[in-house]
């Protein structure tokens, strides 16, 4: 499956929320397919959970990168919001952890679980806003 197509599906499904918040989403994807073995529905759910968080906290813009690098598919979702408080970073993937009133705290923990099931990694950091980076093994070509 081409990760770029999964991301485009996520962008289409969150387009209305982005328009309501007057946010610009800038995709920067490799020109060539970024192929991984995956459960497309589950991977879409993981990306959508992360993108929805970015849509909640971004001020004006979200950048989404997708590239192949050293045998990995790298997806980076970067918003221009306040970022994640340093003391919260170690907990954001914990099940039921939420800083939002009424938040269930399931979205990011589910995203991490899905990425892990695909033999990938996910991390969060701050760089002028929150940055989520997902790394998945590329599909081996024969």
Language-model regions, residue ranges each:
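A conserved beta-strand-to-alpha-helix junction within the catalytic ATP-binding
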Residues: 1-12
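Conserved micro-motifs of the catalytic ATP-binding
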Residues: 35-38
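Short beta-strand/loop element within the Bergerat-fold HATPase_c
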Residues: 61-71
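Acidic ATP/Mg2+-coordinating residue in the GHKL
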Residues: 79
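Short conserved segment of the HATPase_c
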Residues: 84-96
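Short alpha-helical Gxxx[C/S/T] motif in the catalytic ATP-binding
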Residues: 107, 111
């Amino acid at each position: 499956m081409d990760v770029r197509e999964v991301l485009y599906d996520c962008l289409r499904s969150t387009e209305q929320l982005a328009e309501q918040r007057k946010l610009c989403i800038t995709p920067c994807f490799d020109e060539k397919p970024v192929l991984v073995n995956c459960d497309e529905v589950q991977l879409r759910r993981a990306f959508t959970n992360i993108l929805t968080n970015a849509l909640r906290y971004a001020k004006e813009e979200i950048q989404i990168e997708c590239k192949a690098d050293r045998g990995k598919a790298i997806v980076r979702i970067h918003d221009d919001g306040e970022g994640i408080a340093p003391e919260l970073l170690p907990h954001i993937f914990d099940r039921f952890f939420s800083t939002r009133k009424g938040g269930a705290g399931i979205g990011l923990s589910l995203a991490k679980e899905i990425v892990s099931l695909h033999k990938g990694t996910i991390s969060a950091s701050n760089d002028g806003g929150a940055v989520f980076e997902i790394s998945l093994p590329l599909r081996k070509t024969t």
